[in-house]
Amino acid sequence: MPITSNEISVEVNGQQYTLPAGSTLGDALKVSRAPYIAGTAVGILKEVAEEKIEIVTEYAINTPRGEFRIEINNPESPSGKLWAEHFKEYEGKSIHWASPEALAFGPFEAEIKPSRETGSFEAFEVMFGAGGFDPHNTHLIFSLKRHTAEYGTPEDGVFAEVVTGRKILSRLSREDTILGIEPIIEWEQISEKNCTTDLSVPLEDGNSIFTYFEVELSRNAPKGAEHFYALTREGTLNVDVTTSSFISDDGLKGVTAPYENFEPRREGAISVRTVGYGLGRIYISREERPSSLVHSVVGQVTKGIELIKLAEEGQKLSVESLPPQIVLLGHSFEEAGLVLSSIGVELIKDGYTGEDAVIVSQDPPTTLEILGEAKVTAYAVPRDKLIEIELYPEKAPKSVDFFRHGLELKTKTVGKLPVYMIYDDTYLFKTEKEVVKYKEILPENTPTDKVLGGEIGITNQAAKRMGTIGVRLGDDELFGPTGERFSSTNIVGRIINPEKLLAVKEGDVIYVTEIVRK
């Protein structure tokens, strides 16, 4: 059905929709029912006229051994123009000859004037060369190391350089061919683009809209995948840092993740830094980068890479992960059983199995391991052993970070907290993780007049028992929840149902889940 002057055609996440002229971004989201979380940024690309695209200088060459890219030194040079006009003709060409110094795809006919002079070449330079100085016997030559040779190159000599995928060249053999060559149009060359949270933005005919990105997580990195699940628990990813080559979310910066998967970081690769500065940070590559010994690849963007490229610092993006995370902690056996049976996973019950049982741990601990084994053992306790808490990150950000880190609440929905001591109406706890060894607890949100019953305190470094966590059931005007003076106590939150502590004894373990205020 043809589009009239009163209508516009837009694309939302790859699907075409016809809207009335003057429609806004919000209208498109309503009509398309596209995946969207309020407050997240949406990418918009306008249809770009051909003359608005600058001269292409980078090309991707695909081979049976992988992809590498070349960058044209001067598109206006004779060889640069020859390449731009005929590069598609080189598809299907095989390696005609190879030496330790160079390899050549061809032959083919080209309008070049071969030089008989000896040329000097650096590693990874690219040039045309005529075998026997015959233009009908031209080859596309890639230098593998510094050397000199008579290749019958045209007067302008080297016209390009291999910029990514250089290791691919050393893996090529005589039977390999060029499978495809594609120009890379840099996003910086496309002027009409936008990434916005404003749903009142008017749309134009030909707009492409991207509301979310989809991720496929790697079975080679089950723990790293769980790290990503934890970061995007609310279905969003924060854009804390942007560069030309990546965006990153620092939400789990400082949280340890193991190195599991060594592979190239392709465009859209998701990786986690496993050592050094930025430990725990999640990166999404905007362009191809080599493998790294400090970046474990945990997944790949399979839809919506455009949104990754358009995103701006400070924005929040909507994300969907495949497979979806299996979340058992905090649920009953009945709830868990319904979910697991629908995906063919056997549930093995452990611990308390009464009607009020709530799952507090699972083995294996990760979604991808559960799916791989098709079974999971879930350990449960009576629901009155699960304590609900509310934390105060606005008032005590560093202390709350310490608390979440110690109980692993950054990566799990239920944390474990051993009871260290009980006296009067005071309950003291120590985390299993020895967080005090590598995290400071400076005074923060210290009480002034009174501590309310049920408030959670942490002893700061003004006292010897730094890192002790405590709760009092009653109000106190002299001492904090850990029994220390107010100046040595940081208030990090409150227990919503403190009466549950009455049944707790020294040596017991309580389980904690955070209730987030909306």
Swiss-Prot record:
Protein name: UPF0288 protein Mbar_A0706
Top-level taxon: Archaea
The family this protein is said to belong to: Belongs to the UPF0288 family.
Record-linked InterPro entries: Methan_mark_3 (IPR016466)
